[in-house]
C-alpha cells in the first residue's frame, strides 16, 4: 500500500468515529499526478448529492505533460462505496455536529486509487489541549526511560 497524501490535521481536530475505504472516479491525468504524489487533502470534505457521495475541495495538481485535456485541480470527485455504506454516510452527514472527511489517499496492491474516509465529530478547544498534553507526556516518558537505561 503506497500512501500518497495524508490528512494529519484531521486526527488532531476531530474524534474519529468510524472509517471506510472508498474508490474514486478519476481522470487519467489525475492518476498520473497522484503517482507523482501531487495531492493535498487537508481542506477536503465529503458531501451527498442525489444519493451519491462526493469528495470536495481535494487538490490534485495538474499533470505537466498533459495537453489541453488536463483536469481542474479542485473538481468534485465521486466516491465508490457499497449501498449500505452510502446510506450510513448519508444518515451521518445529515446529523448535526457530524461530518465526513478523508484521512488518506493511497494506491492499493492492485494499483487502484483509494481513499480512507471517516465519520468524525469536532473536538472542542479543551479536547485539543488534552491531546497535546497527552502527546507531550508520552514524549517525556520515552525520554526519561532512555536516560534511565
UniProtKB/Swiss-Prot annotation:
Biological processes annotated in GO: trans-translation
Family matches, as Gene3D superfamilies: 2.40.280.10
Location in the cell: Cytoplasm
SUPFAM superfamilies in UniProt: Small protein B (SmpB)
Primary subcellular site in the record, as a coarse category: cytoplasm
Keywords (A to Z) from UniProt: Cytoplasm, RNA-binding
Record's GO cellular component terms: cytosol
Source organism superkingdom: Bacteria
InterPro entries cross-referenced by the UniProt entry: SmpB (IPR023620), SsrA-bd_prot (IPR000037)
Family affiliation: Belongs to the SmpB family.
Function: Required for rescue of stalled ribosomes mediated by trans-translation. Binds to transfer-messenger RNA (tmRNA), required for stable association of tmRNA with ribosomes. tmRNA and SmpB together mimic tRNA shape, replacing the anticodon stem-loop with SmpB. tmRNA is encoded by the ssrA gene; the 2 termini fold to resemble tRNA(Ala) and it encodes a 'tag peptide', a short internal open reading frame. During trans-translation Ala-aminoacylated tmRNA acts like a tRNA, entering the A-site of stalled ribosomes, displacing the stalled mRNA.
Name under which the protein is recorded: SsrA-binding protein
Organism of provenance: Wolbachia pipientis subsp. Culex pipiens (strain wPip)
Name of encoding gene: smpB
